[in-house]
Amino acid sequence: MAEAKDLFKEFKVQSVSEFFRRNAAMLGYTGKIRSLTTIIHEAVTNSLDACEEAGILPTIRVEIEELGKEHYKVIVEDNGPGIPEEYIPHVFGKMLAGTKAHRNIQSRGQQGIGISGAVMFAQITTGKPTRVITSTGGEIVEAWVKIDVQKNEGKIVKKVKHPNPKGWRGTRIEMEVKDVKYVRSRQGVYWYLKLTAIANPHAYIELVEPDGKLVVFPRSSEEIPKPPVEMKPHPKGVMVDDVYTMAHRSKRSSVKRFLVSEFSRISEKKIEELIKYVAAIRLLKSEQNEEIKEKLREKLINGDVDSVLRSFGRKWKKEVEKVAKIMEKPPEKLTWQEAEEIVEAFKLMKFLAPPTHGLRPIGEENIKRGLTGILKPEFVTAVTRSPKVYAGGIPFQVEVGLAYGGQISGSEILRYANRVPLLFDAGSCVITSAVRSIDWKRYKIDSFDSAPLVVLVNVISVHVPYTSTGKQSIADIEEIYNEIRLALMDAARKLALYLGGKYRRMYQIKRRKTLEKYLPEIARSLHILTGEPEEKIREYFLKLIESKIEVEEVESVEVEEAEA
């Protein structure tokens, strides 16, 4: 029988980088086409976020050069604010590091893995470092970065500085990758950038394909999106560990001040209510009679906390005083049990929904600009819903765009999360299920699959509930599903009005031509019978036809608008 110390000889601590090196598929590096698209996605989203935060209209150039079979050089350059020299190894070489992962803020990337994951993929497929050229407006820094996977640290293996007489500012990334493939498929780089351009009409994007062909996705809006605002966590959306960890990191003077200043919808008055609820929870736990306990708990759930407290006689005032003292002590001295009681009270209390001013949708006009500029449809409409919350306290917002006809040849569902295209895992995404659940025939689309219709859905949130770390599919959350359906139906009603008018006009044109076809014969016959000039008779009937068609047009529009 082996001894315990022998069993643990192979025990080893694995770094985050080492874990993802062995499990690159979790980051989206699975399949030759998808892996290349993932690299471009990580670099481009970084560029867009950086430009928007700095108030710069993004200009992004992507170059893909074929070096051999399934071997490419990838270059992504932007006109963003640049990266300070000391942050280069952290940005490109350290996993779970970034400017947004620790903040409650809407962003395209959330995990602090993105671009460092791309650097690691390049490194494990070619063994070569990633070349980074960047400037914040001063001298240009050229650095070659590798990841030390054992330590989860970026290492600059070579660095050169250059003068910058023209004041260039931005970042250029160059990396070699193998085991990838460039194709113009629905999951490839070209399609990804096309979809990115639709959702980001303020961006100018260039793509140089491996055959040297230059593709330009022009800017169709000069409006820079307002940067998202960091949002405080809502009491209904936190766990015990959140409260405990935040309290121990807080610099506030008391637990009360910590709760009021670092959570949304908690005021001084709410603290008084919280004290009562925590006291009531404690007293309920001391109640021996299960039947009485259940009745009192029912009252507490219904918000009658004062009645619950009074039912314990004189004891309740002492318990309230004890809890009030907890609120006055330093937050770093908050115990786990006390944090549990606070979160349990949060679940019973009623709060206003979290503020949603920090969410930044694309906007209806910009969706229409993006769809029109790239797809050239004959009709386009968009709907941005009011913000809502899921999981009790996480704000989100849904917007939808529909583009019909024109240069569109078939149906397409364009899925986005915080403006980022989701190209993979469509079958497990709530957007797909919501679009498929719509009865499109009600909106004059006989067959969704064969209709010249593009459906854009963008889900915005500080915490998009992805189904995996690959961030390509949104979980089937009931509140999100319902909001997508409502937005789709709203937009589809506008499309139905347009199609109704289009079909009606086609019918009226055909009808007019049929009637006009017989006018010469009618005019001749009436001329013989009445002696009136043929031209006068023809003009009379033309006016009569036009008048009749106009009346029918107005009546049909009124009926359709009432039905919509």
From Swiss-Prot:
Catalytic activity: ATP-dependent breakage, passage and rejoining of double-stranded DNA
Binding-site residues for ATP, renumbered to this chain: N46, D78, T99, K100, G109, Q110, Q111, G112, I113, G114, I115, S116, K471
The UniProt record lists the keyword Transit peptide: no
CDD domains: HATPase_TopVIB-like (cd16933), TopoIIB_Trans (cd00823)
Lineage top rank: taxon: Archaea
Keywords assigned by UniProt, alphabetized: ATP-binding, DNA-binding, Isomerase, Nucleotide-binding, Topoisomerase
GO MF term (any one): DNA binding
A GO biological process held by the record: DNA topological change
SMART domains found in the cross-reference section: HATPase_c
Gene3D superfamilies found in the cross-reference section: 1.10.8.50, 3.30.230.10, Histidine kinase-like ATPase, C-terminal domain (3.30.565.10)
E.C. number: 5.6.2.2
Free-text function comment from the UniProt entry: Relaxes both positive and negative superturns and exhibits a strong decatenase activity.
Assembly with partners or alone: Homodimer. Heterotetramer of two Top6A and two Top6B chains.
Family of the protein in this entry: Belongs to the TOP6B family.
Database matches in NCBIfam families: PRK04184.1 (NF003218), top6b (TIGR01052)
Protein name: Type 2 DNA topoisomerase 6 subunit B
Species name: Pyrococcus horikoshii (strain ATCC 700860 / DSM 12428 / JCM 9974 / NBRC 100139 / OT-3)
UniProt gene name: top6B
